[in-house]
Amino acid sequence: MHAYVYKSQRKQDTFVYLATRDDFSGLPAAVQAQLAPLTFVLDVALTPERRLAQADAATVREALGKHGFYLQLPKTIVLAGECDHD
């Protein structure tokens, strides 16, 4: 299975993987509105051996098969002193 990866120009470190290149029809309108414009960055074969930087390839394949897209959000980093310890 191939995935076509697009980077959000609005939200840093946010990527959309599509099952079909340039087919944003399965992406909810609210998500498109938050992330657009999206710029194509990569065509990747999602083989079982494939390692992705921030996502599990099997999870991406499953989402592409079910929904036609996978949304990769940036990792949240909590810095010391920024969280409330009760």
From Swiss-Prot:
UniProt xrefs under Pfam families: YcgL
Domain of life: Bacteria
Protein name (record): YcgL domain-containing protein XCV4171
Database matches in InterPro entries: YcgL-like_sf (IPR038068), YcgL_dom (IPR027354)
Xref: SUPFAM superfamilies: YcgL-like
Domain YcgL: 1-83
Organism phylogeny: Bacteria, Pseudomonadati, Pseudomonadota, Gammaproteobacteria, Lysobacterales
PROSITE patterns membership: YCGL
Signal sequence interval, chain numbering: none
